[in-house]
Each structure stands twice: as C-alpha cells, then as structure tokens.
C-alpha cells in the first residue's frame, strides 16, 4: 500500500512543480497592493530616463467617471499588455494581505507583505479585463479595482 502511494506521489510532485513554473515570460509585471490602490512596475522596460516604468492605479470616483464608465471598476491608470504574449505577474503587498483577482484571465493570487508570489497569463485576444482585490483588507477594500487592457503587440511597443 505504501509503495503505491510513493509511486503516485513522486510524479505528482514533479507535475505540480512544473505546472506552476513560468517558462521564459516575455514581460514581468510587479503588482503591489496598498491600502487602497495598486502599484505596478514593468521591470523589463525602461522609460526615457532609463528608469523602470512604474505607476499607481486608483479607482475613479463617481464624480470623475466618464460617460459609459463602469462604476467601482474604472481606474485612472490601466495595465496595458500585449496579446498572445507570456506575462508573469509578481504579486506582493506593502501593508496588509490583499488578493489580485482577475476572473476573466483565471488569476487569483494572494499578496502578502514581504512575500513574492508569481502567476503567469497568456491573453488570447484584445480587450479590457476587470478584476478586484479579493481579500477584505480594510474599510476601502471595495476601492481596489484592477483593469488590464490587452492590445496588439504593435500598439504595445509604440
């Protein structure tokens, strides 16, 4: 009986490890949760001053929402990613536990202070994808939307 369990366990552990391994991503994006906004950093790209591209993303309030905008889901700075490209998200938190949730892309990853978690994604088509912090992290927890916009590789590079 123990031999059967061992024969099943070792290949299973190897498969679990390989499933979670990100194979040579083209882009890495650091997502850091704060009370109550997200910070992003494209570590593979540099701006004109040769610094990493980084920005904060806050929810757009109802008074600033444009016509047709989604209440409680729209942000001032979206994450822009190319379609059909392997992307690795490195997720962490600065203060309390958060959770980076993007159901349409199959992402839900907890963000812990002092710990880095990585998930990979391949976006198959252009579009705008909405998600939110999925961990109750304080009084303004509902004010932490996540918006990822997927564009063609040509648009992304310009």
Question: What does each model-found stretch correspond to?
Answer:
Residues 1-158:
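Non-transmembrane, membrane-proximal soluble domains of secreted or membrane proteins
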């Amino acid at each position: 009986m123990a031999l059967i369990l061992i024969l099943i366990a070792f290949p299973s552990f190897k498969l679990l490890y390989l499933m979670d391994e990100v194979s040579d991503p083209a882009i890495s994006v650091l997502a850091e949760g704060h009370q109550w906004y997200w910070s992003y950093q494209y570590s593979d790209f540099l701006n004109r001053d040769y610094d990493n591209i980084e920005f904060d993303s806050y929810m757009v309030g109802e008074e600033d929402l444009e016509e047709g905008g989604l209440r409680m889901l729209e942000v001032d700075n979206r994450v822009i990613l190319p379609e059909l490209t392997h992307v690795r998200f490195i997720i962490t938190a600065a203060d309390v536990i958060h959770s980076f949730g993007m159901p349409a892309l199959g992402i839900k990853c907890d963000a812990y202070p002092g710990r880095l978690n990585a998930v990979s994604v391949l976006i198959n088509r252009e579009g705008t994808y909405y998600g939110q912090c999925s961990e109750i992290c304080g009084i303004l927890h509902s004010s932490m939307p996540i918006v990822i916009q997927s564009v063609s590789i040509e648009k992304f590079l310009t």
